From Swiss-Prot:
It is a lipid-anchor. This is Flagellar L-ring protein. One of its GO terms (biological process) is bacterial-type flagellum-dependent cell motility. Its main location: membrane.
Length: 236
């Protein structure tokens, strides 16, 4: 048992020493290499999307149906093209759930017997009673308010067979040893990209938007890794 505990502690210490925060002591958080965010981490199920119908030959025409705009600038439709994602999130939600359950149960059983013989008299009686009372009360309330306004450039990383685009983009800003990271990925239709080559976040299917940070402030807000391990394995 002692050896197992020692092994667990050693593994925890090793994991803690490998933390990136240890390598950044005394210096600002390092930024990711350019191009590291151009990956759609969750591959879509291509079989769920219909294939692009066969198009008629355009002959010698310069018109491109995918652009669908004669007097507007070209929009992103090919792998490597860049478009802008407009993120405007202003959500508020409030949930209030209340549960009250009560049950009472009572059972009784009586038994009696008496008799007489030439040698002795006997009398016997019994009484059994059982009762239970169960009551459960629960009250839960959740309030959430989010407001986010950002613009981020994304790159077309793939084109599905039906013409929809896979996009992925990231943005990192480092201020006073604090690194703010914005990631966005999803599937868009070329027709939803406006004339300014901008698409709203609510028109992105399978959208994956994350906004967070890494640095000294985040380390203070998070509990120590040792406490997280104890909270994970503690049965109480």
């Amino acid at each position: 048992m002692r050896m197992q505990l020692t092994a667990v502690l050693a593994a925890s210490l090793l994991a803690g020493c490998q933390n990136q925060a240890f390598r950044e002591i005394g210096q600002a958080p390092s930024m990711s290499p350019i191009g590291s965010g151009l990956q759609y981490t969750q591959a879509p199920q291509l079989a769920a999307y219909p294939k692009q119908p066969h198009q008629m030959t355009a002959g010698y025409s310069l018109w491109n149906d995918q652009q669908a705009a004669l007097f507007k600038d070209a929009r992103a439709i090919n792998v490597g093209d860049i478009l802008t994602v407009d993120i405007q999130i202003d959500d508020k939600a409030s949930f209030n759930n209340e549960t009250d359950r009560s049950r009472t149960n009572s059972s009784g059983f009586n038994l009696g017997a008496s008799g007489e013989s030439q040698t002795s008299d006997f009398e016997w009686s019994g009484n059994l009673k059982y009762g239970s009372n169960i009551k459960t009360e629960g009250d839960g309330k959740t309030e959430r308010s989010e407001k986010l306004r950002l613009l981020v450039a994304a790159v077309v990383t793939g084109v599905l067979e039906n013409g929809n685009l896979l996009i992925s983009g990231s943005q990192e800003v480092r201020v006073n040893h604090e690194l703010r990271i914005l990631n966005v990925a999803g599937i868009v239709r070329p027709r939803d990209v406006d004339a300014d080559n901008i698409i709203s976040y609510d028109r992105i299917a399978e959208a994956r938007i994350s906004y967070g940070g890494r640095g000294r402030l985040m380390e203070v807000q998070q509990p120590p890794w040792g406490q997280q391990v104890v909270d994970l394995v503690s049965p109480i």
